[in-house]
Design a protein with these regions (language model features):
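Glycine-rich, flexible loop/turn motifs
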Residues: 1, 9, 18, 42, ...
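Enriched for short, Lys/Arg-rich terminal
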Residues: 54, 65-92
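Residue-level marker of positions within ordered structural domains that often coincide
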Residues: 15, 42, 81
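Conserved phosphate-interacting/catalytic interface
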Residues: 37
Length: 92
């Protein structure tokens, strides 16, 4: 279950289904990612075709990422069965 979301627009999408804070062409994929994160109990639950799940390195070690589109990612970390620090980033 998602416990914390860093990105204000992503939080608005998750809590209120209001996509004004995210890129409009990403809204549908972001809804899918958030729904799957909310239902996920383990990181393996996020290994879905098209998400390109991968662990992050360096300063972001401990986080995982899934692809939204091009260079946009949703990053997050797991603690027990909870999903924490969900963020929506352009990594370039």
């Amino acid at each position: 279950m998602i416990r914390s979301i860093r990105h204000k627009g992503l939080r608005r999408l998750y809590e209120d289904d209001d996509s004004r804070g995210v890129m409009s062409e990403h809204a549908e994929k972001l809804r899918d990612i958030l729904a799957r994160l909310d239902a996920a109990g383990t990181i393996a639950d996020m290994d879905v075709p098209g998400f390109r799940l991968h662990p992050l390195k360096g300063e972001s070690k401990g986080f995982w990422a899934v692809t939204v589109r091009a260079n946009w990612r949703v990053i997050f970390r797991f603690a027990d069965r909870d999903v924490l620090d969900v963020d929506y980033i352009d990594y370039h």
